[in-house]
């Protein structure tokens, strides 16, 4: 009608809207949206971070480029971390924490090292780390198994997306102030529009639109070997169809123990996949996953020049396979 006021959704869906606000208002599903990595390599780097933090922080730029090249195609994802609220860079030699975490179920591990010279990371065997072999982490960095609490990595990099700073930094501060140990700020987890986003290690499950209560529950669950599915984006060990399929099986089967479900096979290609999820006890499920474009168009990140229709993963069906069907 001429002269009528635009609807609430019309006002929100502009390129200047905060991407997380719009995504939440449209109830965009978070399942099947996690960043993919079989292994995470996390380097403590105080001070400010740029949008591409490995080459736009106080870390030596040439070293950042070399680390990116070394990790390319190996399944290792590198990110910088810092303590909540501690953004000053004192300069000079200082001990840095380094973590490596392999997230493939059945072979999960989390190791930690303390170093002064980050160039030592170039001595790592990235291909082996991506495949789950942690020996070079011990040999090059003196790393050992992490014996402390699970880690909560909160994306706070406002140079990457303002929602990460506006929503992530308060969450990291709240968790830290409440006595939760193992909380770090991290440079990038993908999916800015799901801020605050959090990665929980060692099991590698990411969470979107995360509140302090959910993350505390997820950390308690990780400590007990249990996966919290509320707000879960998926396990980084799997691709996006696999992430959605695994979470669907957890809900259908009521199986929340970590490490017992694996994506054993994926057939098909976009926009439709048949994903086989296996249990350690021998059970199997076939999950139909369909990709579609999210509607209406919305900002996929803050400051995006155009509105987008991000892909979403919808679970169409979950079917438990009987022994006679396993060979098909």
What is the meaning of each model-derived region?
Residues 2-328:
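Histidine/cysteine-enriched polar flanking segments
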């Amino acid at each position: 009608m001429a002269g009528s006021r635009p609807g609430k959704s019309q006002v929100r869906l502009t390129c200047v809207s905060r991407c997380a606000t719009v995504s939440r208002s449209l109830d965009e599903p978070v399942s099947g949206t996690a960043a993919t990595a079989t292994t995470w390599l996390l380097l403590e780097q105080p001070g400010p971070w740029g949008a591409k933090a490995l080459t736009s922080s106080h870390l030596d730029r040439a070293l950042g480029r070399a680390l990116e090249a070394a990790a390319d195609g190996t399944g290792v994802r590198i990110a910088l971390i810092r303590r909540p609220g501690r953004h000053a860079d004192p300069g000079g030699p200082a001990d840095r924490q380094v973590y490596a975490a392999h997230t493939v179920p059945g072979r999960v591990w989390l190791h930690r090292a303390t170093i002064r010279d980050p160039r030592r990371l170039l001595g790592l065997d990235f291909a082996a780390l991506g495949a789950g072999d942690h020996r070079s982490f011990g040999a090059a960095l003196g790393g050992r198994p992490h014996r402390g609490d699970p880690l909560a990595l909160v994306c706070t990099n406002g140079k990457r997306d303002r929602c990460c700073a506006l929503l992530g930094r308060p969450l990291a501060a709240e968790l830290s102030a409440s006595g939760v140990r193992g909380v770090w700020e991290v440079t990038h987890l993908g999916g800015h529009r799901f801020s605050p986003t959090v990665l929980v290690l060692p099991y590698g499950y990411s969470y979107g639109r995360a509140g302090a209560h959910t993350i505390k529950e997820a950390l308690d669950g990780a400590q007990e070997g249990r996966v919290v599915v509320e707000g879960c984006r998926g396990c980084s060990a799997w691709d996006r169809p696999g992430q959605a399929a695994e979470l669907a099986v957890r809900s259908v089967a009521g199986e929340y123990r970590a490490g017992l479900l694996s994506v054993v096979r994926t057939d098909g290609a976009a926009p439709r996949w048949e994903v086989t999820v296996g249990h350690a006890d021998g059970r199997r499920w076939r999950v139909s996953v369909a990709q579609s474009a999210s509607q209406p168009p919305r900002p996929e990140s803050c400051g995006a020049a155009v509105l987008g229709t991000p892909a979403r993963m919808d679970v169409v069906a979950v079917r438990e396979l009987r022994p006679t069907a396993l060979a098909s």
